[in-house]
A protein has these predicted regions:
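Short acidic/polar segment at the start of the alpha1 helix of CheY-like receiver
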Residues: 12-16
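Acidic, metal-coordinating helix/loop segments flanking the phosphotransfer/catalytic sites
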Residues: 32-51
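Conserved phosphotransfer cores of two-component systems
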Residues: 44-47, 69-76
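Non-catalytic signal-transmission and effector/linker regions of two-component phosphorelay proteins
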Residues: 1-7
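Charged docking surfaces used in two-component/phosphorelay signaling
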Residues: 17-25
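The short loop immediately C-terminal to the conserved phospho-acceptor aspartate in CheY-like receiver
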Residues: 56-57
Length: 81
């Protein structure tokens, strides 16, 4: 079995790096998105995402909009920050 894949979504690159570094040390495969639109695109391209860590306040598409879009198609766990 491969590593669990986690999508980290935050418009602040420092926060993304902090979370990514922590998760990679725990042996997770980490994908990053800098805004909501990018997050939705990545989610639908990568079918095996096990968890999404999602910032609420972002440009283009906020976290609530991203959550609604993904929830319409998937029950993947989402942690809102």
């Amino acid at each position: 079995m491969g590593k669990l894949k986690i999508l980290v979504v935050d418009d602040e690159s420092r926060m993304r790096k902090l979370v990514k570094d922590f998760l990679m040390k725990k042996d997770f495969d980490v994908l990053e998105a800098g805004d909501g639109e990018q997050a939705v695109d990545i989610f639908f391209e990568e079918k095996d995402i096990a968890l999404i860590i999602l910032d609420v306040m972002m440009p283009k598409m906020d976290g609530w909009q991203v959550c609604r879009e993904i929830r319409a198609h998937s029950r993947v766990p989402i942690i809102m920050l």
